[in-house]
Structure formats: structure tokens, C-alpha cells
Amino acid sequence: MGNIHSVTKSLESLGEEIILIKNFNDSNLCKAIILPGVGSFDPAMNNLTNKDLINDLKNWIKSGKSFLGICLGLQLLFESSDEGKVQGLGILKGKIQKIPNIVNQRIPHMGWCQLLPTKKNTLFGIEELNNWVYFVHSYHAIPDDLNIIAAAIIFKSSGIA
């Protein structure tokens, strides 16, 4: 799950200690877990299964401990994805769908977009409306409960969560 190097470098620049978890026993030393990801849904879920990390990861998240899923790491939290046949972690109810084709809009969507918070959360306040982030993605989350959306972007004329 590919952007580990980028995430590691970002956290190191903030002075954070990094522990790469290969066995969940290592998580006892962690104050938070980040599940990064670049790649495809099914191989990523198979990787978590083969490393016997799924139940421990679910328990960590359900306990309320700090967790951040980035890109594919977020997608894996959902029940399913248009990209594959393997079930996701199912922590978030809903699915991952391919971004619909929109005239004059290239998929994968690549570029800077303004992140629009929909409510206060632990990552940013609702008043922080000038957060620009870089995207490279072809899929977006469709949660069953729209109230879990913390931020969205405007992609052409439709909002993408």
C-alpha cells in the first residue's frame, strides 16, 4: 500500500516517531494509526488479510483510538468498492464508486481542490475554508449516512465526498 514513504516523511517533518506495524502487537507503542494507500482495493484487502491485521485494525478503530485512512486507506473502511469483488472492512456503511464521467473532466481526477469542511471535527474547524489539497483519484466514497461526511470537494458541478 504505496504512499508509506510520503506519509513517513511528512510525519518525520512534524517530529513524530514512526512505527511501521507488521504485527499488531507493535500497535501497543502507537498513539495513532495511519492506514495509507495507493493501489487497488482487492489486493490491499488481501494484504491486510494475509498479514492477519483485519480484526485488530477493526478493534483499534471501534475502540475510538486515533485513526486516519488516506486515499485507499479510507476506501478500505467501507463495505465494498466498484473496483473489486472483495469485501471491505465494513467499519463505515456504504461503498466506494468510480467517479462518474463528466464532459470535459478527466478521470482520474488530478489536481488541487479546495477541501470544504461540512462540520467541525478533530482535523480542522468549520471556519478553515481555505484548505487546498492535491488529489489523484478515480473513486469516491458514498456513505449510507451522509452525516459522517467531514469534508467534500466540488468536482465540476457535483460534490464529491
Predicted regions, residues:
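N-terminal beta1-alpha1 ligand-phosphate binding loop
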Residues: 1-16
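An anion/phosphate-binding loop that grips the pyrophosphate of nucleotide cofactors and donors
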Residues: 30
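Amide-donor transfer/coupling interface in amidating biosynthetic enzymes
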Residues: 24-27, 62, 95-161
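Short linear Ser/Thr-Pro motifs
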Residues: 6, 80-81, 138
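Cysteine-nucleophile active-site neighborhood
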Residues: 39-110
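Structural motif
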Residues: 34-36
